Amino acid sequence: MTAERHDMDKIGVTYHPKSDLARRCAGDIHARLEPMVREVWLASAWDDEAHEKHVRGTGLLLTCGGDGTVLRAARAVIPHPVTLLGVNLGRIGFLTEMTFEALMPRLEEIVGGAGRIETRAMLEAEMIRAGEEVRSGFHALNDVVVGRRTIGRTVQVTVRTDHTPIGNYRADGIIIATATGSTAYTLSVGGPILHPESRELLITPVAPHLAPANSVVLPGGSLVEVEIAEGQMGILSVDGQPDWDLGGGDVVKVRTSEHAARFLRLGPPGDFYLRVGRRLNWLSE
């Protein structure tokens, strides 16, 4: 679905702090925006304190880097309805909208209201241990992964949807992905590509032993539970962030978040398939 445009009086610019190019590009964008809007702020994408200070009331947040910078921004703006515009300085950039060179001549047009809002579902996850919630509030735009803790070994899990078992797996891991995440980790293990604005969830096993490797597509309102078998050790990874250790009997619950990511798009909706085709080398530029 397409959401309404947000107030453009306050705009933020973030950048990947380990990239000198991203820092320079963000500074140039910030300088260009200053005479155009009431307030513009600049921060490292890793500076959580700056985001907490500035994000309220921000209408647009430009991210300079790659998809990882966009993923971090999508989590950082929760619970505020901030629209994201990704400036691609990375490699593939499924989530980014345009290059720095393409952005600069269009900044005034963007501030003036050009484009449309694309709304994308996010995931929320929690950890249950001995029947008690031990960690909640994980949010992911791409995916939640329950994986093996040790290279060379598998992890044995039971996967349930809405409390009904759908499979026992001994595998490298289980990916629960959004439509956005369908072009990320799950794609690399043979999962399908979903339209970015669909709300379905994907469950995809990673290298399952003596079990089907097919993905399962679930309605957006589904609850997914992944339980670690007794005597097993695993990890929880949310959008590729630092892992959390899991042990036998631990359960990871995943559902669609009440928060959604908003992206500013300047091309028609069909551009998604063109972008995917080109970045996966299915189409020539």
Task: Please place each PLM-identified region on the residue numbering.
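ATP/NTP phosphate-donor binding region
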Residues: 1-60, 64, 101-116, 127-138
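Short, well-ordered beta-strand core segments
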Residues: 61, 84, 174-175
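Catalytic core of DAGKc-family lipid kinases
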Residues: 92-172
